[in-house]
C-alpha cells in the first residue's frame, strides 16, 4: 500500500490558519528576499537605487543624502544600470542589455554630464558595446567594441584605438573568450586599470585554432541559424593568451608593452589566471601550467628607462600541489600590504587546510597567519593595522561563514570574530562589503534566518544602521507552513558527510516519508550551507510531504584537502558512492520509505544523479538529470583537465572512458529516468543528453525526456515554470505509483 503524505493545516496562536507553500509561490518568487550591497564611492559615501529608481548618494558621517541621478534621467534612455565617474562629473547609463554567456552581455551606453544635466554629444559611443568602465581617478573611460579596445581621455573626446586585431570568435581584446569567462576569470572583462589610472593592462585571447562547437538556434525563421563558439574540450587546443600594458597618459607615443610569461610556465601550454595591480609601478600576474598543479605568481616592475615591464625570476613565487590541483576552484589571489612588497594569500598548509599566509620574500618562508582544522575562505581587506577575512571555523560547521578581524599592527596578532555573536540564531552565513580603507563596512547575512544587511563602523565594529531586514517577507511568511531544516553529519569509515535535511512541517519520526536527494557534488562545491531559501524543494516538503536531503561528500570544499582532492583524476566515483552511503544511513533513521526514494541534480548534479540511478543498488525508484555532463571528453578543457588530467593513453584516458553515463545504459532499466536539456546550452552542450538518449535507445531502455528549444544552461523565462511543473508531476507520479 502506498501512502502519500500531506501536511495538515495547523492553527497558530493568532487564530489564523497557516497554509502550505504552493508551486505558484515558488514560480512567482513570492517569498524571495532582498539584500543591500552599498556601491561605495569613498571611505564614507555610497550610492544606492531607491524604490522609485532614483540613484541616491548617502554620506554616513553627515547623514545627508541627495539624488545624483533622477529616475526621469534613467528612464529617458531606458537605463537599467549606471556608473559614476570617480570625479563625479559624469555617469554612464546602460540600456539595451543583451545577455551573451554567464557573465558577458552587450549594451548601449549614454554619457550624462552631471554638471549641466545633459547627455554628452559628439563622439558618441558606438553600439553595442561589450564592456565599458571608468578609470579609478578622473573621468577617462575605456570600452571594448567588436573585440577591440578604445580609450577616451574625456567623455566628449574622440576615442583612441588601442588594439586593431580584434575579430569575432578569433581574437578577443579586453574581454575573455568563452572558456576563460566561464572557467578561469569568472568575469565579463579582461582589462585592469592601475590604481591611479596611469596604466591599463589587458589580455588578448587568440582562438584562431580552437575547435568550434556549433548548434542550431531555431527562432521563428524558416531556417534555423547556427551558433558557433570556439570551445576547447578536454585535450583540445587551447586559446593563446598574452598580457599587454599601455600608458594611457600618452598612448599614441608609446604603444602597448607585452608582459613576459615566466620561463617555467612558457615552456609548455599554460593559462593566465589573474592580474593584481600592486601600485602604479608594480603589477602581479598569476600563471598556471595546463595540468594546473603548478601556479606561478610573478611580480613585475615598470622600467621607465627602457619602457618595459621587468619580471625578475627572484620575484616568482611558486605554489604546487602534490595531491591534487593548485588552489580550490580557482587559485587564490594575493592581497598586498601597504609596503607594496609583501602580501597575504590563502593556500594549503602542511596539514592540508587552506589558510592565510604572509609572504615577504618567498612562499617557502611564508608565515602562517591562521591555522586549524577549518578553512579561511576569503580575504576581504588589508589595512595598515587590520586584516578582515571570512572562514568556517566557528563551532566546527563547514557550511557557515563568519567575518574575522586580525590586528596585524601588534605582535602577536590578535583575532576577533566580528559576526559570531551577532543575531546568532538568525545569522550564521555572512559576507561583507568594505568602503575605502575599511572605514565602514556592510555585513550581509544570508541565513539561516531571514537575510539582513547592516552598516558598521570599521574602527569599532559597532552597528550603525539596518540597511535591509526583509520585514515584508517576514510578515508574508507568518501564514506559511515552512518545512524544518536540520544540518548534521554522518561519520562513515573516517569520512565525514555533512548533510542538510528538510522535513515537512508536521514531521513525525514514527511515520514513513518519501525521500528526494538533491545533489550537485562537483569538485570544490558546497551544498550544505546555513542559508535561507524558499524554493522548489521547500514546496515539495511543505506541500507534498517529502523529506529532502543534500549531502556534501568527497570532492566538496572547505573541509580540507583530503576530502577535496579525493576525487582527483577519478570523477564520477566517490561523489556517487557518498550519496548512496548517505541514503542507506537515512533509511536506518527509520522515517524514510525505502520504496519511495528519488534523486535529482542539475549540470554536475545531473551527472551524479544519472550515475547514482545507474549504480545498480536498487535504492532509487526514479530520478531526474537536468543538463547533465555525460562524458568528460565533451566538457571544457580548463575545468575538466583541472580535475581529470588529459584524455590520452599515457595519462587518464581509461577513466575518461569508464566514467561516462552511456557506459551504464543497461542499468537504467529498473528506474524511472527523466532527462532534461536546453538545445542552446553553450556550457554543457546538448550533445551530452543526445548521447545518453542514443545509448538508452540502443539498449532498449524506456525513459522520459524533455528538450527546451533555444534555451541555455539556465533554462530561464517560461521554460523555468514548465520545467518545475513537469518535474513536480514526475516526482508525484513516481511516489504515488505502486511497484
Model-derived segments and spans:
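Beta-propeller folds
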Residues: 1-440, 446-451, 528-529
Amino acid at each position: 500500500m502506498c501512502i502519500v503524505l500531506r501536511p495538515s493545516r495547523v492553527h497558530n496562536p493568532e487564530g489564523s490558519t497557516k497554509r502550505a507553500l504552493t508551486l505558484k509561490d515558488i514560480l512567482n518568487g513570492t517569498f524571495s528576499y532582498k539584500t543591500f550591497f552599498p556601491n561605495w564611492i569613498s571611505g564614507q559615501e555610497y550610492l544606492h537605487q531607491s524604490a522609485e529608481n532614483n540613484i541616491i548618494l548617502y554620506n554616513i558621517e553627515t547623514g545627508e543624502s541627495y539624488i545624483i541621478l533622477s529616475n526621469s534621467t534613467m528612464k529617458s534612455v531606458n537605463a537599467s544600470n549606471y556608473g559614476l565617474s570617480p570625479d563625479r562629473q559624469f555617469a554612464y547609463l546602460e540600456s539595451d542589455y543583451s545577455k551573451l554567456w554567464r557573465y558577458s552581455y552587450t549594451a548601449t551606453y549614454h554619457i550624462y554630464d552631471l554638471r549641466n544635466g545633459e547627455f554628452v554629444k559628439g563622439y558618441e559611443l558606438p553600439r553595442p558595446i561589450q564592456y565599458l568602465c571608468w578609470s579609478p581617478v578622473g573621468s577617462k573611460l575605456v570600452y571594448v567594441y567588436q573585440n577591440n579596445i578604445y580609450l577616451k581621455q574625456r567623455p566628449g573626446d574622440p576615442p583612441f584605438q588601442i588594439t586593431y586585431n580584434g575579430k569575432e570568435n578569433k581574437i578577443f581584446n579586453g574581454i575573455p573568450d568563452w572558456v576563460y569567462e566561464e572557467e578561469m576569470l569568472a568575469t565579463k572583462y579582461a582589462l585592469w586599470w592601475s590604481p591611479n589610472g596611469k596604466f591599463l593592462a589587458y589580455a588578448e585571447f587568440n582562438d584562431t585554432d580552437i575547435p568550434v562547437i556549433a548548434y542550431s538556434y531555431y527562432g521563428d525563421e524558416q531556417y534555423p541559424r547556427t551558433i558557433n563558439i570556439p570551445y576547447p574540450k578536454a585535450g583540445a587546443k587551447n586559446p593563446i593568451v598574452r598580457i599587454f600594458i599601455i600608458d594611457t597618459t600618452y598612448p599614441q607615443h608609446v604603444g602597448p608593452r607585452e608582459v613576459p610569461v615566466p620561463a617555467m610556465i612558457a615552456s609548455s601550454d599554460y593559462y593566465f589566471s589573474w592580474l593584481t595591480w600592486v601600485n602604479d609601478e608594480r603589477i602581479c600576474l598569476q600563471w598556471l601550467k595546463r595540468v594546473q598543479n603548478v601556479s606561478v605568481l610573478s611580480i613585475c616592475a615598470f622600467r621607465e628607462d627602457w619602457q618595459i615591464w621587468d619580471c625578475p625570476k627572484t620575484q616568482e613565487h611558486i605554489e604546487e600541489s602534490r595531491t591534487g590541483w593548485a588552489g580550490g576552484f580557482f587559485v587564490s589571489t594575493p592581497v598586498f600590504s601597504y609596503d607594496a612588497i609583501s602580501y597575504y594569500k590563502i593556500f594549503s598548509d602542511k596539514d592540508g587546510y587552506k589558510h592565510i599566509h604572509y609572504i615577504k620574500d618567498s612562499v617557502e618562508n611564508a608565515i602562517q597567519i591562521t591555522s586549524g582544522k577549518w578553512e579561511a575562505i576569503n580575504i576581504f581587506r588589508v589595512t595598515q593595522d587590520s586584516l578582515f577575512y571570512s572562514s568556517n571555523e566557528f563551532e566546527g560547521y563547514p557550511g557557515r561563514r563568519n567575518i574575522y578581524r586580525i590586528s596585524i599592527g601588534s605582535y602577536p596578532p590578535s583575532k576577533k570574530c566580528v559576526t559570531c555573536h551577532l543575531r546568532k540564531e538568525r545569522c550564521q552565513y555572512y559576507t561583507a562589503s568594505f568602503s575605502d580603507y575599511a572605514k565602514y563596512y556592510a555585513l550581509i547575512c544570508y541565513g539561516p534566518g531571514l537575510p539582513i544587511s547592516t552598516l558598521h563602523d570599521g574602527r569599532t565594529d559597532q552597528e550603525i544602521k539596518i540597511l535591509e531586514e526583509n520585514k515584508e517577507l517576514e510578515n508574508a511568511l507568518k501564514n506559511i507552513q515552512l518545512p524544518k531544516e536540520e544540518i548534521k553529519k554522518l561519520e562513515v569509515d573516517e569520512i565525514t558527510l555533512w548533510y542538510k535535511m528538510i522535513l515537512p512541517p508536521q514531521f513525525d519520526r514514527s511515520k514513513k516519508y518519501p525521500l528526494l536527494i538533491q545533489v550537485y557534488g562537483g569538485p570544490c562545491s558546497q551544498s550544505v550551507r546555513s542559508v535561507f531559501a524558499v524554493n522548489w524543494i521547500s514546496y515539495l516538503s511543505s506541500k507534498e510531504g517529502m523529506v529532502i536531503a543534500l549531502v556534501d561528500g568527497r570532492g566538496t570544499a572547505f573541509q580540507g584537502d583530503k576530502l577535496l582532492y579525493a576525487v582527483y583524476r577519478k570523477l564520477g566515483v566517490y561523489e556517487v558512492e557518498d550519496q548512496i552511503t548517505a541514503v542507506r544511513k537515512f533509511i536506518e533513521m527509520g522515517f524514510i520509505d525505502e520504496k519511495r526514494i528519488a534523486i535529482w541534480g542539475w549540470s554536475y548534479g545531473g551527472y551524479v544523479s544519472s550515475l547514482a540511478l545507474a549504480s545498480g543498488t536498487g535504492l532509487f525508484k526514479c530520478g531526474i538529470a537536468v543538463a547533465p555532463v555525460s562524458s568528460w571528453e565533451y566538457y571544457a578543457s580548463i575545468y575538466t583537465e583541472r580535475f581529470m588530467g588529459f584524455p590520452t593513453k599515457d595519462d587518464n584516458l581509461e577513466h575518461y572512458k569508464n566514467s561516462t553515463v552511456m557506459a551504464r545504459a543497461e542499468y537504467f532499466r529498473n528506474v524511472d529516468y527523466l532527462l532534461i536539456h536546453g538545445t542552446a546550452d553553450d556550457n554543457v552542450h546538448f550533445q551530452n543528453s543526445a548521447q545518453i538518449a542514443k545509448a538508452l535507445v540502443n539498449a532498449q531502455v524506456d525513459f522520459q525526456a524533455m528538450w527546451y528549444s533555444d534555451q541555455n544552461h539556465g533554462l530561464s523565462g517560461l521554460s523555468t515554470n514548465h520545467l518545475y511543473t513537469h518535474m513536480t508531476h514526475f516526482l508525484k507520479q513516481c511516489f504515488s505509483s505502486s511497484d
